[in-house]
Regions:
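Perimembrane helix-loop junctions in membrane proteins
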Residues: 50-57, 92, 148-158
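Juxtamembrane intracellular "pre-TM" segments in multi-pass secondary transporters
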Residues: 155-189
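Helix-loop junctions at membrane interfaces in 12-TM secondary transporters
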Residues: 45-67
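Substrate-agnostic recognition of the 12-TM MFS/MFS-like secondary transporter fold
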Residues: 1-22, 31-39, 63-153, 185, ...
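Juxtamembrane/transmembrane-helix boundary motifs in multi-pass membrane proteins
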Residues: 26, 55-59, 93-97, 127-128, ...
Length: 211
């Protein structure tokens, strides 16, 4: 379920928000203001779900999945504005460096965070181990929000061919999918890759259970 929420919540909302995002002269207000409410704030409910677990496991699961879905859908809804803001701030010849460098640093910090979370899960009793892990995630993503708020976005007028309504946006998407063979093949490839990844979660559970 977490895998489905993670993938669907990231990609699906972008289809509904891309058109309205394209019509905005500035994307930063969406990324900062809307992003805080839809993407950052939900993670602060995860420690509450862990605290509720000893008293009401059902309530804890409801809070957890609701907060996780809220976070995922919010991140997907804001993603077009974030991507456009990054494109405005970095020229074409610098974007690969930006994404590569940030992915490298983020992965390294993620490894350290995973190791520290594993240590907390072992050394603290339940539910405090999960409370501390979730709290660390909430604090970290909030700190990243403050860094993101320092971004200086160049103001640009919306493109002349920007979709004027949601219906026009969907028509524009269909024209691109039907007319661009390479992009259509790319979408099919991404779909098949994600289908192939469906078994990874079961492999992880099986490894933990048998090994």
């Amino acid at each position: 379920l977490l895998g489905v929420l993670s993938a669907a919540a990231w990609y699906l909302p972008q289809l509904f928000t891309a058109g309205s995002t394209e019509r905005l002269a500035r994307k930063k207000p969406v990324v900062i203001n809307v992003g805080f409410l839809l993407e950052r704030l939900p993670l602060w409910f995860l420690p509450l779900s862990a605290l509720a677990a000893p008293y009401s496991p059902t309530l804890a699961l409801i809070i957890f999945f609701a907060a996780y879905a809220w976070h995922g859908l919010g991140a997907g809804a804001v993603a077009p504005a974030w991507s456009d803001m990054i494109a405005r701030c970095f020229p074409v010849n610098k974007r690969a460096w930006f994404f590569g460098f940030t992915a490298f640093i983020g992965t390294g910090i993620g490894i350290l965070g995973a190791a520290f979370s594993s240590w907390m899960l072992v050394n603290y009793p339940f539910p405090l181990n999960f409370v501390y892990s979730f709290l660390l995630a909430a604090v970290s993503i909030t700190i990243s929000w403050f860094s993101l708020a320092l971004t200086r976005e160049p103001v640009r007028q919306p493109p002349a061919n920007a979709a004027k309504s949601s219906g026009a946006s969907w028509q524009k998407i269909m024209v691109i999918v039907r007319g661009d063979h390479n992009y259509r093949q790319f979408l099919i490839t991404r779909f098949l890759i994600n289908v192939g990844r469906m078994g990874l979660g079961y492999l992880t559970v099986s490894a933990i259970f048998f090994w």
